[in-house]
Each structure stands twice: as structure tokens, then as C-alpha cells.
Regions:
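Secretory targeting signatures
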Residues: 1-32, 54
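N-terminal edge beta-strand
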Residues: 26-47
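Exposed beta-strand and adjacent loop surfaces of beta-rich binding modules
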Residues: 29, 62-69, 115-117, 133
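Short beta-strand elements
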Residues: 127-140
Length: 140
């Protein structure tokens, strides 16, 4: 009886131990952080063509990553800025640039001059990896 238990234990160890010992270099811990969304004290004018830079730091190379920016929420709760793109993040720091035309008519878009949030989200395979935000002052 004791020999059968020892044999069963030995078989279990042989089956499960290799998965514990073998490491194929993937720790499973991927770190992605949004360092900044835009620059400090951004000011945009109605009708202006602007570039928004999102600075991202990644612990590893990641392909098929979606970065989305959204902001300038108007009186109707509509995001007047919404862009999304699929990129490859390099290990280290990346700067992703978005070009955007600010709406030309503030009453038409229900967008008044003022300070607005611009949010950035990084996701992969439906999982949100990082989020960040910045502010922009919208003037006439």
C-alpha cells in the first residue's frame, strides 16, 4: 500500500514538475505605462490642425496593440476627438503621434471654449494595458 502511494506520488511529480522547472523566458509580467498625453499647458484653437503626442513606456516588444485617444466631450456628451490605431510597441519609450483638425465652429459642434480632457487607452486582445490623460485648453 505504501509502495503504491509512493509510486502515485512519483508519477504526479514527474508530470507536474517539468512545468515548474522549465522557464522559456516568459515571466508573463508585461508592463505598459502611458507617460504623457500631449504636452503641459496645451492650447488649441478652433479650426487648427494639431498634433497630439502620446508617450508610452513598455517593458517588452508588443505587436498588435491598439492605442485610442478620445476627448473634447461636448454638451451632448459626444467625443469630438476620437482616433484609434494599431501599432507595434518597442521595448522602452515610444512616442505615438496623432494629427487632428479641431472643429471650426464651436456653436455647431456644441463645443465651448474651455479646458477639456484627452484620454489615451492602450489595449491588446481586448485587455486594457494602460490608461492616461492630459488636458487641453480650447480657445477661439
Amino acid at each position: 500500500m505504501a509502495g503504491e502511494k509512493l509510486l502515485a506520488f512519483s508519477v504526479l511529480v514527474m508530470v507536474f514538475l517539468p512545468g515548474c522547472i522549465l522557464d522559456f523566458g516568459n515571466s508573463g509580467a508585461v508592463s505598459v505605462k502611458i507617460i504623457s498625453v500631449g504636452e503641459k499647458d496645451m492650447v488649441w484653437h478652433f479650426g487648427e490642425r494639431v498634433t497630439l503626442n502620446v508617450t508610452v513606456k513598455s517593458s517588452t516588444l508588443l505587436d498588435n496593440v491598439t492605442i485610442t485617444i478620445a476627448g473634447l466631450k461636448n454638451e451632448l456628451n459626444q467625443m469630438k476627438l476620437y482616433k484609434s490605431t494599431v501599432i507595434e510597441l518597442a521595448k522602452g519609450t515610444d512616442i505615438i503621434s496623432f494629427s487632428y483638425s479641431v472643429p471650426t465652429c464651436s456653436p455647431c459642434n456644441r463645443l465651448d471654449p474651455g479646458v477639456y480632457y484627452v484620454n489615451a487607452t492602450i489595449s491588446r486582445n481586448g485587455e486594457v494595458l494602460a490608461e492616461g490623460s492630459g488636458t487641453v485648453k480650447l480657445v477661439k
